[in-house]
Every structure is written in C-alpha cells, then in structure tokens.
Swiss-Prot record:
Keywords: DNA-directed RNA polymerase, Nucleotidyltransferase, Transcription, Transferase. InterPro entries: DNA-dir_RNA_pol_omega (IPR003716), Pol_omega/Rpo6/RPB6 (IPR006110), RPB6/omega-like_sf (IPR036161). PANTHER family: DNA-DIRECTED RNA POLYMERASE SUBUNIT OMEGA (PTHR34476:SF1). One of its GO terms (cellular component) is DNA-directed RNA polymerase complex. It comes from Bartonella quintana (strain Toulouse). This is DNA-directed RNA polymerase subunit omega. Belongs to the RNA polymerase subunit omega family. The RNAP catalytic core consists of 2 alpha, 1 beta, 1 beta' and 1 omega subunit. When a sigma factor is associated with the core the holoenzyme is formed, which can initiate transcription. SMART domains: RNA_pol_Rpb6 (SM01409). It catalyses: RNA(n) + a ribonucleoside 5'-triphosphate = RNA(n+1) + diphosphate. GO terms for biological process: DNA-templated transcription. It comes from the Bacteria.
Length: 132
C-alpha cells in the first residue's frame, strides 16, 4: 500500500492548513461512526480521511461547509420577513401600525411639576432598622 502524503491531497485542497483541518474533521466524523467511502485497509482514521480527500470520494467544499457548520454556536435560519405580509395587505397594515392618541400614550413626560411634587410628598419614609 502506498502512503498518503500531503502532495497527494494538495491539488484537491490548495492550503495545507485547510487540508489538516478538513482531514481532522473527517477523521472525527469517522470516529463517530460516519460511513467510510474508501477501503479501510486496516488504516487509522486520519489516514482514511486523507485517502478519501486524495481519491476525491468526498468533496472538499462539502467537508469545509460541514466543518464550519459544526463550529458555529449560533446558526442563522433564513425566515421570511413579516413586514412583507403586512405591506401586501395595505388596509390591515394601517390598523396594525396605527398610532394611539396622545392621551393614551401620555406617561411621566406629561405629568406636571406639581403632580410630581405631590406624589413625592405622599411617599412614606420607611422606619430605620438595624439592617443598615
């Protein structure tokens, strides 16, 4: 059996460092029970992974995509935007995005200074305790 070298794989994967990452990822997949695409010939998983890359039984682009996906902690999912649905129904969009009147949206900004002072004066001071 001929030994698998980096030169056998370098024409499939341009960068040697990327080749090591891809072969290591594939070797881990084989260790976890993935189907081997070449004859094992009593070789260890890293050698089998390099042989698979050299014989092009696996696509390096697919391996790279799978490696990136396995390293991601947060996977983004493309979801259709809800705004398009609202814009398509213009009558419904106006009712959904309708603004409220100023009286309903009035908050602390609309309180007068006298109302604030009356509220502060109405507060009860807690009794002093031994906690502090």
């Amino acid at each position: 059996m001929a030994r698998v070298t980096v030169e056998d794989c370098i024409d499939k994967v341009d960068n040697r460092f990327e080749l090591v990452l891809l072969a290591g990822h594939r070797a881990r997949q084989i260790s976890q029970g993935a189907q081997v695409t070449v004859d094992r010939d009593n070789d260890k998983n890293p050698v089998v992974a390099l042989r698979e890359i050299a014989e092009e039984t696996l696509s390096p682009a697919d391996l790279k995509e799978d490696l990136i996906h396995s390293l991601q902690k947060h996977v983004e999912v493309d979801e259709p935007e809800m705004a398009n649905e609202f814009l398509s129904h213009s009558g419904e969009a106006e009712t959904v995005f309708a603004t409220t009147s100023e009286e309903e949206s009035c908050s602390f900004d609309c309180m007068s200074e006298e109302d604030l002072l009356a509220g502060i004066e109405g507060l009860v001071i807690p009794e002093k305790s031994d906690d502090y």
